[in-house]
Amino acid sequence: MKPVDCFLHCPKCGQPAAQPGNAPFHCAACGFLLYFNPAIAAGAVLLAPDDTVLLIRRAKDPHRGKLSVPGGFVDAGEVAEDALRREIREEVGLSLERLDYFCSLPNSYHYRGVTYQVLDFFFLGRVTAKAVQTDPAEVSEVCWIRREEIALEEIAFDSVREMLRRFLSQSSS
């Protein structure tokens, strides 16, 4: 189910939707128009001094038990870099000053029966040490992995898998 599928009636005037499931939602009775833009998320490839990559094992759904990069959703009023720094602090207890933009990719986030469209912004960062402090509600395991040992089939999201594919091909050239 997509978010637009939840609107069977106009949220402004209460009239039944003339064409439920169409995006944007448009009410024929009062003219109300509601867009369903993607949510924004940010993630980072974090490199240690020995050039290993930090991957986390997700502790919750979607994709519990799969690997991903640290990151999460951008809150209203936040810029992607600040949201990413916050998420990295919350998930693995690391503070980063410098983040370099790498790429952006669309993603679908399936959660509790609803599929959200997301635009993921990815960054590259370096850490000075591998000591982390995880939030067990978010992260079940931290893995420092050599680039050539990253198993893309173990990665949680299509966008993260594609970003890592690009990162790995760029690093090997």
Which residue stretches match the model-derived regions?
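Active-site-adjacent beta-strand/loop module that shapes the phosphate/pyrophosphate-binding cleft
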Residues: 103-131
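Conserved Nudix-box catalytic region and its N-terminal flanking loop in Nudix hydrolases
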Residues: 48-90
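NUDIX/MutT-family hydrolases
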Residues: 133-164
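Short cysteine-rich clusters marking metal-coordination/redox-active sites
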Residues: 10-13, 27-30
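Residues immediately within or flanking Cys/His clusters that coordinate Zn2+
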Residues: 5-9, 24
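A short coil-to-beta-strand element that immediately follows conserved catalytic motifs
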Residues: 20, 95-104
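Short Cys/His-rich "knuckle" micro-motifs
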Residues: 18-24, 36-40
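Conserved N-terminal beta-strand and adjoining loop/helix that marks the start
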Residues: 29-53, 73
